[in-house]
C-alpha cells in the first residue's frame, strides 16, 4: 500500500514539474514571438529608407548649393579686388609717367630758356656788324632800354667793389641788356668808362660761351642804364 502511494506521489510530482516546465516554455515562446513581431513591425522598410536618404540628400543639397554660391561670390570678390588693385596700379603708373613727362618737359623748357637767355635782352635791339674794335663781332643798341632802378640814395659815384651795392646794380644792368642772368655769367672785367657815372664790363655767358662787352651809364635816382652791347669774337 505504501509503495503504491509513494509511486503515485512521485508520478504526480513529475506531472506537475512537466506542467510547470511546459508553461515556462510556452511563456518563453510567446515572448520570443512578441519580440520578433515588434522587431519586424518597427524595422524601416526599404521605401522608408529610400525616402529618408532622399530627404537627407535634399537637405544637404541646398547647403552644398549655398557653399558653391558662396565660393562663386568669393571668387568674384577676389577677381574684383585684383581688378581694383590693377586699376590702382595703372593709375599710379600713369600718374608717375605724367609727372616724369612734366618734369622732363620742365627741364627741357629750362634748358631752352637758358640757351635762349642771351638773346632775350637783345631781341629788339638794332644790330650792326663790327664795333668799336676789331675784336667786336656785332653791336646792339636799343633806345628803349631803361634804367634798372637803385636802392642807393644821395650823391652817386661808381664803386667797383664786388661786395658793394653799386657793383650788384651794375651787374643787374648788364644782365638786363644781354639777357644773361647774374648766376649764369662770369665777370671778366668791370670798371670805369671815362667818368664816375659811366662804366663798362665784359662778361662770359656760361651756357653758350659767348662774350659780351656792355656799356652802362648812371641815371640819377633811377640807377644804371645800358646804352650799348657788343658781342665779342
UniProtKB/Swiss-Prot annotation:
Protein name: Uncharacterized membrane protein YrrS
GO CC term, one of those recorded: plasma membrane
Transmembrane segments: 21-41
Signal sequence range: none
Basic and acidic residues composition-biased segments: 48-57, 66-108, 135-144
One of the Pfam families matching this protein, by short name: DUF1510
Source species: Bacillus subtilis (strain 168)
Keyword Membrane in annotation: yes
Membrane topology classification: Single-pass membrane protein
Subcellular location: Cell membrane
Keyword entries, A-Z: Cell membrane, Membrane, Transmembrane, Transmembrane helix
Phylogenetic classification of the source organism: Bacteria, Bacillati, Bacillota, Bacilli, Bacillales
Amino acid at each position: 500500500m505504501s509503495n503504491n502511494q509513494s509511486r503515485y506521489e512521485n508520478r504526480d510530482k513529475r506531472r506537475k514539474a512537466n506542467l510547470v516546465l511546459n508553461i515556462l516554455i510556452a511563456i518563453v515562446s510567446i515572448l520570443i514571438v512578441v519580440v520578433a513581431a515588434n522587431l519586424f513591425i518597427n524595422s524601416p522598410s526599404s521605401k522608408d529608407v529610400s525616402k529618408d536618404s532622399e530627404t537627407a540628400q535634399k537637405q544637404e543639397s541646398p547647403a552644398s548649393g549655398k557653399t558653391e554660391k558662396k565660393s562663386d561670390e568669393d571668387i568674384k570678390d577676389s577677381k574684383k579686388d585684383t581688378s581694383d588693385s590693377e586699376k590702382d596700379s595703372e593709375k599710379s603708373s600713369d600718374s608717375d609717367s605724367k609727372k616724369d613727362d612734366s618734369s622732363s618737359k620742365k627741364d627741357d623748357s629750362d634748358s631752352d630758356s637758358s640757351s635762349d637767355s642771351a638773346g632775350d635782352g637783345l631781341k629788339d635791339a638794332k644790330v650792326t656788324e663790327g664795333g668799336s674794335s676789331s675784336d667786336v663781332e656785332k653791336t646792339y643798341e636799343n633806345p628803349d632800354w631803361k634804367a634798372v632802378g637803385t636802392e642807393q640814395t644821395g650823391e652817386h659815384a661808381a664803386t667797383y667793389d664786388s661786395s658793394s651795392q653799386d657793383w650788384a646794380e651794375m651787374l643787374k644792368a648788364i644782365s638786363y641788356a644781354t639777357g644773361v642772368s647774374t648766376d649764369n655769367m662770369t665777370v671778366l672785367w668791370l670798371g670805369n668808362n671815362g667818368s664816375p657815372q659811366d662804366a663798362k664790363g665784359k662778361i662770359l655767358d656760361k651756357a653758350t660761351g659767348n662774350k659780351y662787352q656792355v656799356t652802362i651809364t648812371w641815371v640819377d635816382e633811377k640807377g644804371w642804364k645800358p646804352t650799348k652791347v657788343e658781342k665779342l669774337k
